[in-house]
């Protein structure tokens, strides 16, 4: 079965061939069939190819490996394997509280009406900065982390709702008066500057120990 990426390349190739036909033989547009070919070459096929390509990019840009393909993100990828439950990203990643293949996207998209589009636009900006600009060092979020992203998954979960601590401050959490990540509760995040002093979880080694037993 032809994948989206292959289909996009095929459509681009078809568009180029049709455009060459029109350029080499402009007289072809004098006929009705020629006008149809020109319309396909200049409008329909490019639009469809762009749509397929954009859709494929949208899907690929959600992948964890896409985010970590930028060298400046490498330590953030390593932090997902820190063997310490207080590291919030690591605890979520290692315990499958978030999809492993969409770990970055799951926590860093905006769960609002146009959140996905906003996240994609930021992703395109990251690609632009990576290739043509100068990434900030250290990197940081554009805006303070919104509790909405945490509550999207945790609100309604028994482990969250049954916690007296959460119950008392739920209104302040929803209004962002108290931050989940910077108010002394869950504030150990990627902490990339401290990766040299921590232990790392090796899932392959863990599986080997289980097999040995």
Where are these regions (language model features)?
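Short sequence/structural segments immediately N-terminal
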Residues: 1-213
């Amino acid at each position: 079965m032809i994948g989206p990426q292959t289909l996009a390349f095929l459509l681009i190739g078809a568009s180029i061939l049709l455009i060459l036909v029109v350029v080499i033989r402009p007289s072809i547009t004098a006929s009705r069939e020629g006008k149809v070919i020109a319309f396909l070459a200049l409008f329909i096929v490019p639009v469809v190819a762009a749509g397929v390509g954009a859709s494929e990019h949208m899907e690929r840009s959600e992948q964890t490996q896409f985010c970590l393909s930028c060298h400046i993100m490498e330590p953030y990828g390593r932090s997902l394997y820190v063997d310490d439950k207080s590291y919030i990203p690591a605890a979520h990643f290692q315990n499958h509280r978030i999809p492993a293949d969409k770990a970055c996207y799951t926590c860093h998209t905006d769960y609002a009406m146009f959140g996905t589009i906003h996240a994609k636009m930021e992703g395109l900006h990251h690609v632009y900065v990576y290739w043509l600009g100068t990434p900030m060092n250290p990197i940081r979020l554009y805006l303070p982390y919104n509790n909405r992203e945490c509550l999207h998954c945790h609100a309604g979960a028994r482990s969250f709702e049954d916690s007296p601590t959460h119950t008392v401050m739920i209104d302040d959490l929803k209004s962002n008066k108290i931050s989940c990540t910077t108010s002394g509760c869950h504030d150990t995040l990627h902490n990339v500057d401290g990766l040299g002093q921590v232990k790392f979880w090796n899932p392959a080694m863990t599986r080997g120990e289980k097999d040995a037993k």
